[in-house]
Amino acid sequence: VFQSSGDTEVLGSMLQRWPVEEVLAELRGMFAFVWHDAETREVIAARDHFGIKPLYYSCRPDGTLILSSEIRVIRFLLDKEAKVNRRALAQFFRWGSVQAPDTILEGVHCLPPGHLLRWKEGRLEIKRWFTPKWPAQNEWISSPQDQLAAVRQGITGSVQAHLVSDVPVGV
């Protein structure tokens, strides 16, 4: 029996019972989370399918891992050690953005969308957990009316799913 109506409690319960890959396969929507498994002494972090929620990390030379949903927190913790990533700066000036895993700070990375981070005893492993499944050409919808209906159904379903909240939502 859950003590709250929040999704965080449900996620924690799932992560206690099942491997993280199975939990991720069940999640829908936007999320970024960090989980510490006290039994295995492993830190697990994951980011949603399309990277809507950010997750930054820095693995220090001494093996310490810093994680945050805001880069400024990591910048603060690194203090004087934080330096500008010149390659990312050039990327920003050229394209107007910096692509994950790069960030504007050297040694600070953004976990890419649909990726999973595992950290144990100073060892960092990052792997992709989500790959979009594109329909085969023989599964394409050819009729404009059917295409319109499929798009309408997809958008309506997505909006309805995102209107579910712990607090009142207004449109």
Q: Can you describe what each PLM-predicted range is?
A:
Residues 1-171:
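Cysteine-centered catalytic environments shared across enzyme families
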